[in-house]
Regions:
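Cationic, low-complexity basic patches in intrinsically disordered or flexible, solvent-exposed regions
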Residues: 28
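C-terminal regulatory/oligomerization modules of transcriptional regulators
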Residues: 2-10, 16-24, 130-159
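Basic, amphipathic "hinge/linker" alpha-helix immediately C-terminal to the N-terminal HTH DNA-binding motif
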Residues: 92-110
C-alpha cells in the first residue's frame, strides 16, 4: 500500500455494488487519500447510531442492528480497527476513531437529510430510509449540499 493510503475491503453480502469512496469525496476537508468501501461506511454509521442510542456498542449489537452474522461483523470490525476507523477496548466495546467518526457523521447526515426529503415528497418512511441508504454513498459533496439546501427550503415551505 502507498504511504497514507488505507484500503478497507469489506463485502456487503446484500450489496454486490462495491463502490469505493474517498473521505475527500465525502467531505471537503483537505487532500485525504483514504479509501473506504460503501459497506464499511454502513458499519461505521451503524456504530455511530448505536453509540448515540445505547452509549456502549459491542460487535453483537452491530450484528443485530445490521442483520449480518456475528462472524461477518467481527471480521468487518477487525478490518475497520486495523485501518484506523474503530477502536476496541479490553471489554470488547467499540468506539470510533476521529477518522471513523468523520465518515460516520457524514454518512449519517446524508441519510437523515435524504430520508426527511423523500418523506416530505410523499414517499413512505420505510422506503425513503431504504432509498436514502443507497443514495447517501454516491452523491458528491456539491450535489449533497445543494440537495440539502433545497430539501430544507422545500420542507419549511410545505409546513
Amino acid at each position: 500500500l502507498q504511504k497514507n493510503r488505507f484500503h478497507v475491503i469489506l463485502f456487503n453480502n446484500m450489496n454486490a455494488n462495491r463502490r469505493t469512496h474517498t473521505a475527500e469525496n465525502l467531505q471537503q476537508r483537505g487532500p485525504c487519500t483514504l479509501k473506504i468501501q460503501e459497506s464499511a461506511e454502513n458499519y461505521l454509521e451503524a456504530i455511530l447510531v448505536l453509540m448515540q442510542k445505547n452509549g456502549q456498542v459491542r460487535s453483537i449489537d452491530v450484528a443485530h442492528y445490521t442483520g449480518f452474522s456475528k462472524p461477518s461483523i467481527s471480521r468487518a470490525v477487525g478490518l475497520l480497527r486495523d485501518n484506523g476507523y474503530v477502536s476496541i477496548d479490553q471489554n470488547g466495546l467499540l468506539g470510533l476513531t476521529e477518522a471513523g467518526l468523520k465518515i460516520a457523521e457524514t454518512i449519517y447526515e446524508r441519510h437523515t437529510v435524504l430520508t426527511a426529503f423523500l418523506t416530505a415528497l410523499g414517499v413512505d418512511h420505510e422506503i425513503a430510509a431504504e432509498d436514502a441508504c443507497r443514495i447517501e454513498h454516491v452523491l458528491s459533496p456539491e450535489t449533497f449540499e445543494k440537495l440539502k439546501a433545497h430539501a430544507k427550503e422545500y420542507i419549511e415551505n410545505k409546513q
